[in-house]
Amino acid sequence: MRRNMKEHVAIGPFIPYATLLAGLTLITVAPITAQQPATPKGTGQSERDSNRSAIVCEPSLLGSPYIPVDSWVYPAVLRLYSLAYVDQVYLGMRPWTRASLRHMLEDIDAEIEDANTYGDSSVGEAQDIYAALIHFLRYDAGMKCLTNQGNSHVESVYTVSRGISGTPLRDSFHLGSTVINNYGRPYESGFNNYSGMSGYATAGRFVLYVRGEFEAAPSATRYSQGLAQALSTVDGTTFLNAATNFPYNQATIPMGPIGTTTDGRFLEAFVSGRVINHEISFGQQDDWLGPGLGGGMAYSNNAENIYSFRINRVEPLQVPLLSRLTGPFRYEFLIGSLRGHIFMPNPANPSGTNPNLPNVINPGDPWVHLEKISFRPTKNLEFGFERTAIWGGKGHGPITIHTFLKSFFSFASPGGNGKNGRDDPGARFGAFDFSYRLPFVRNWLTLYSDSEVHDDVSPIDAPERASWRPGIYLSHVPGIPKLDIRVEAATTDPSRSNGASQYGRFMYYEAIQKQGYTNQGQLFGDWIGREDKGGQAWITYHLSGNEWLEAGVRNQKATTFFIPGGTTLNDINFQVVKRIGKDFEINSNFAYEHWKAPIYPTGIPTYPAGQQTVTTTTIQFTWFPERKISF
């Protein structure tokens, strides 16, 4: 029996918890030297102790953990921004550190706390959000710059139970996904569970962060051999391995049967150091590049986090003269390895000597690097540029400084052996995004858009070839201040603007890097897919700053040029988030989905296509512990 996920129950599930405990213990007992402020002569011990909490640390010298991108903090801050209370928010670059969030709120505390609710119904909403965020940051207020001082904290302990009926989709590279933006977690029809914890330790400029969980999902039939072969043809990959005469185990095509999953893994696990307002980090870590709530064209949490090295300017930078034009700006650089890309040699050109043929059908496990810069020329406008390159991998040139620089500085499509050989500079994508609080309705409406293009420098340069995710957000409804509305559209279908389909072989795809923009089989960009259109909408009633009732809809439709017969997916979902006290959260979600694809299940389009109905019921319990350990 073929299994895409190895079934085991022994020591694996306990690895994240053991590592978290060991890491927090290690950094707790390790002495870290930091600058100790001078104490005037004659000062008593009690006075020294009372002064400790008043010491203001230099922010550029203190490490601070990132806030996970699936935290409630982000939609809360996005709403506070759209209510026109915070200005220095970089919507297109997430995650933020806890210290960065604290700095965003420092300038508005007096304004919010002293605001008069008379005549402005949104003031009460802003005050609720501010109070919830201040409670979230309560542990950070006592951080000190003293010898052997630090902070170790269990951030959250949680369990997620998910029941699915029907046949769910888990194929963002082709037919679509029932559950999106979920770190590539496994799920199948039946009972699924994810239970874990997160925690961090800080010491001076250094941070250790770990988020691990135990995952369990049922076995499944998944795709038939005929459907898997048809999708392999769509991708331009080889279905059968000539050396073994068995199908390639392609992570992007979930061919069944698939065994039960019982495993432990890290969602995030990284170490970082603070250097002059930069967080330099290594490990598995979150990223979300784009202002949208439902997806990020360049990067999201739709797939498992990659192992990467990152340099992130976490605080805005002001450059004399330049910032008069661009305003303050932030930037980020990331490089890491992708997994789940299977090596396929090209039997027609095994030696790679024919410049007219690629030397491989698909390289194995390439690397990716990306660069992003975002500007805020005014308090109401943000815009950013991003570039991604996927290069190297088994069968191509090794990952070296030389091959990295070649991919970094290559902007034109190479011809002949430059593309087909080992020295291919890689698959290159460019992104652009912006957000703008509209004039005359600054605290009501925020317009934003995310976009990405393949084989062009920027979507601005080639809008007709670009993919787009525009959105608009109404921060509160007139007469109902607790209600907000958000709508986002999404398309990766270039034929809508230039009349020419790319048959699914353009966005998130590349002629050489055929498994393209994926990690462990799932797109790490926007869940909308390779040649699809659709969108999302949400209407949310806020009970408090971190509690709400929400109804949403989602649509996704692949073109018939991409998937034979096309696909259609529609769902309606409801969410309730409620706190018991301030530190125990119940998050429940119900989704009702219809999807159909004529190519399913045989691989041969059949009409009329059978409609699949899927219901997903999820409940999550999360405890945010009160206590921390200081050292």
Residue ranges and their predicted role:
Residues 373, 515, 611-631:
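Outer-membrane beta-barrel "beta-signal"
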